[in-house]
Amino acid sequence: MSADKAKRSFHMAPDEFRRRGKEMVDWIADYYERVETFPVLSQVKPGQLRAALPAQAPERGESFDAMMADVERLILPGITHWQSPNFFAYFPSNNSFPSILGEMLSAGLGIQGMLWATSPACTELETHVLDWLVDMLALPAEFASSGPGGGVIQDTASSSSLCALLAARERATNLLTNEQGCDGRLVAYTSTQAHSSLEKAAKIAGIGSANLRAIEVDESFAMRPELLSAQIARDRANGKTPFFVCATIGTTSSNAIDPVREIAAVSREHGLWLHVDAAMSGTAALCPEFRWTHDGVELADSYCFNPHKWMFTNFDCDCFYVRDRAALIRALSVLPEYLRNRATESGAVIDYRDWQIPLGRRFRALKLWFVIRHYGVEGLRHHVRRHVELAQQFASWVRADTSFELAAPPPLNLVCFRHRSGDEANQRIMDRLNASGDLYLTHTRLGDRLTLRMSIGQSQTELHHVERAWQRIRDEAAAIV
């Protein structure tokens, strides 16, 4: 397309796209090189960006240079820099250049992979990469596509939990709830430390938050199986229908590891669907020495983990596995006439539209494929081990300082700690650190006490970043206590 023709059509000409694309790659590479110069937590006030934007959209198209100038002037000040090596908040959402390139290619191809027929490579690469991960994480063979189960990429673990809940609901009611709705008797179970998405899933699925039982935890904040069993018995005695339990490998607050094997025994005794949410800590199973966290996963009906947290694959990318794919498909499949095609009717292909809530789906497998091929299992293990090593080093400094204490055992790469002076002091320490822009921490409450969380998992975080963070924490504590 000539420049004149592109101008008449309002499209960007291929030559300009080539030039701007190279500029964008340079900008992203430069951003990563200078990311430490920005305050980690955005310092803007609510409404600041909108006040700087024009009230109406432009009538005439604007130049790419003008857009990028506004990125620097308006957007960057409003960014919290998740890819900063000084980002220690929440759980990581790390990234890598191979993943970014895979995402770019996915956007460039511009496909919609709802059916095998709408892009066979999208479906088959996803199936294959998910099978690779079964081997890489030593997951049960039943989760591979060669057996009765299989894997699919969801957007987040929240969607995986909802899909698991729906499949369990339909298995428990022999598909009646899909036709007639819920009757209020179904009851689901998880721990008090489980992710909030379980409550949202219970609401969406028609189970109701009042029918989601939060089981108490032990001193390490892991679910207590004996309390689960007792609650199930009470619910049955009261005319309820227990049908689903979610165990967690790496709880959001403290990275606690639920005793999956014992929970699975309770689930099987009572005929419940067991879902295992390993959103954060599933990646640890790349390393044989950390596979103790997954003891009992072979007994689960479904499982998920997030490469977009700790496997250098940009958001969003959650890997969801089921032992029996037929149960998932029966719960979610709807086939209108306009989606019928010979490949689907042959029964020889996978249509991932039946494995998720939406119809449409992106080509997420490309970026995951790029990441695995670039790093190899060896490279991924190296970084996981390094992050765990850094976290354990940080935990040792906390133990050695009489002003601080650990709030929970640190099994992997999250350290929960607090100053001994109490909640107000810890809140002030965190607020001062975050306002400084030097690093970013978040908090939780454990044992009803405010607790600081040091989450180590960004792609570029090294020992000197963790050392500096610890020094800054001690400095702020000394300034206020």
Residue ranges and their predicted role:
Residues 2-148, 435, 439, 468-473:
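N-terminal entrance/gating region of PLP-dependent enzymes' catalytic architecture
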Residues 115, 133-166, 213-216:
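Short loop-beta-helix segment that forms the pyridoxal 5′-phosphate
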Residues 160-329:
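Conserved PLP-enzyme active-site core in the AAT-like
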Residues 146-148, 183, 408-413, 445-451:
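Short Gly/Ser/Thr- and Asp/Glu-enriched loop/turn motifs at secondary-structure junctions
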Residues 446-481:
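PLP-dependent enzyme catalytic core of the Aspartate aminotransferase-like
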Residues 405-433:
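Conserved PLP-binding catalytic core of the aspartate aminotransferase-like
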Residues 270, 295-402:
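Active-site C-terminal subdomain of aminotransferase-like
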Residues 402-406, 438-443:
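A short linear hydrophobic-aromatic micro-motif
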